[in-house]
């Protein structure tokens, strides 16, 4: 497919591989995985997407002051703070593209100014849009620099006239000088303040600040592979660390004895509990805690928690922590299934797990982000036999 994206030529940076044929992109990612992870286990061929366009169910656009002082919104040019006006992105869901255009028109009608980062003045910072792939529900999150939002009712009315498919509108206040998009304060302006979507046959509620995979089609491929690697028989206790809104854990619950999910984001934990109830899943519970802290406590001999047979690890891009990995190693589950969106931090964590007596058996890359450098990976690990490895801790005293 020839490149027809205007912003690609303007160096938006959102899809650096757009000019490469898709098979070549997959080859590039395969080579990356092999280089970083091939020493741990055989790397299976990357699972690509049949139609790798308009796959993203979430978009974030930044407001700025455009020519002649007119409000605009778009994406940053690569390596700059220059906002490129938003056009029809080839990666975003087409309804999301249309929604962002409608948000801009409605905001202009309200005469709201863009937030000026250098001066700390203005109102509008970002707009975040989510769309449920199966439900069609659309959530608009307007990120502002202050709580006061004059004319918010007029904005909702104008937006609904231009985009009647929008089902929820939320204001998120982020007054801090920060590169983080979302703040902590949320106010619902219209609708339930969240959307629902169906994934792997289950219904999930998704709130503004909750993590949810951006490519639903490939997410089902990813989770199916993770569940396959877990080899559940219905008798296992499963820990789902970094569980988010409970997607992996709830997908596993129907094949396990019990699931314990751990997540530090309170909104995500509330969503996870609601998702379990909505799907009538009674053998899963979710705990609001830092994954490392909770895993360390659970690994203690007198923790009172059931011994896990399977542990899912699905950390953010920075990977897990040495303390969390040590806790997993101490628990000695039968299997660990590590889901990673960053092969570099995955390689680091696999090195740590290997030193702690674990062995990677299978590595399966999944192309969750076509036309970008990113790739998702699922790894199956099991504990080495006691006589198959030697682990030695050496401490040196003074003068040694």
What positions do the PLM features span?
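Short helix/loop segment immediately N-terminal to the Walker
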Residues: 113-121, 238
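Rossmann-like S-adenosyl-L-methionine
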Residues: 151-400
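Solvent-exposed residues in well-ordered beta-strands and their adjoining turns
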Residues: 62-64, 130, 143-145, 382-384, ...
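Short cysteine clusters
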Residues: 5-7, 12-15, 341
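Short, aliphatic-rich beta-strand segments
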Residues: 129, 135-145, 203-207, 310
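Extended interfacial segments that mediate partner engagement and assembly in macromolecular machines
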Residues: 2, 13-116, 129, 134, ...
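Nucleotide donor/acceptor-binding cores
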Residues: 57, 136-138, 235-236
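Short, acidic/hydrophobic/Gly-rich beta-strand patch recurrent on exposed beta strands
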Residues: 74-77, 141-143, 272
